[in-house]
Amino acid sequence: MAARDATSGSLSEESSALDLPSACDIRDYVLQGPSQEANSEAFSSLEFHSFPYSSDVDPDTSNLNIEQNNSWTAENFWLDPAVKGQSEKEEDDGLRKSLDRFYEMFGHPQPGSANSLSASVCKCLSQKITQLRGQESQKYALRSFQMARVIFNRDGCSVLQRHSRDTHFYPLEEGSTSLDDEKPNPGLSKDITHFLLQQNVMKDL
């Protein structure tokens, strides 16, 4: 009987010793447990965020991507040679029409003007302008004649009077001054003056 009790007590002690963790096991668990849990949580979080669903996309980020795409599209639109060329052509056409309105408005004698020379010069220039209008190769000449008409209408025809052989209003020395040696008038081409003198417009004085 005593031997059975002793054996039973020995087995109970061994069972208790086997069930309880050792001090080393407890220490290892304390040191490794939190790290393993953190790594497990981080891995789970990484797996969760690696493949977001479409409903989880930030709307602000989506809007930013749309704005960037729109900006890229707009930049490529203006860099397109065909679009750029069309825009420049429309701008040139608008500028040309504005210049035409300006020259027509200020290139004719004012109502009530009694200056017959200005009227004669204006008529001569207007005829030449009509001939040049619509000729792509004569754009510069057209603008030169239009500007000359504005200047003569504004400042008078003293330049022509100084160089005309028919004028009697200037001394011979001044009238014989070479046109090429004279200081040029801003906006007035000497070629236009030569053209008018060859047309003999001074006879209408």
UniProtKB/Swiss-Prot annotation:
The intrachain disulfides are none
Question: Which keywords does this Swiss-Prot/TrEMBL entry list?
Answer: Chromosome, DNA damage, DNA repair
GO terms in the biological process aspect are:
DNA repair; negative regulation of double-strand break repair via homologous recombination; positive regulation of double-strand break repair via nonhomologous end joining; positive regulation of isotype switching; somatic diversification of immunoglobulins involved in immune response; telomere maintenance in response to DNA damage
Location(s), subcellular: Chromosome
Q: Which domain of life is it from?
A: Eukaryota
| InterPro entries per record | SHLD1 (IPR027821), SHLD1_C (IPR053898)
Q: Return the Pfam families for the record.
A: SHLD1_C
Explain the purpose of this protein: Component of the shieldin complex, which plays an important role in repair of DNA double-stranded breaks (DSBs). During G1 and S phase of the cell cycle, the complex functions downstream of TP53BP1 to promote non-homologous end joining (NHEJ) and suppress DNA end resection. Mediates various NHEJ-dependent processes including immunoglobulin class-switch recombination, and fusion of unprotected telomeres.
Q: Self-association or partners: how does it assemble?
A: Component of the shieldin complex, consisting of SHLD1, SHLD2, SHLD3 and MAD2L2/REV7. Within the complex, SHLD2 forms a scaffold which interacts with a SHLD3-MAD2L2 subcomplex via its N-terminus, and with SHLD1 via its C-terminus. Interacts with ASTE1.
The UniProt record's further free-text remark is: In BRCA1-deficient cells, function of the shieldin complex is necessary for sensitivity to the PARP inhibitor olaparib.
Instruction: State what protein this is by name.
Output: Shieldin complex subunit 1
Native source organism of the sequence: Homo sapiens
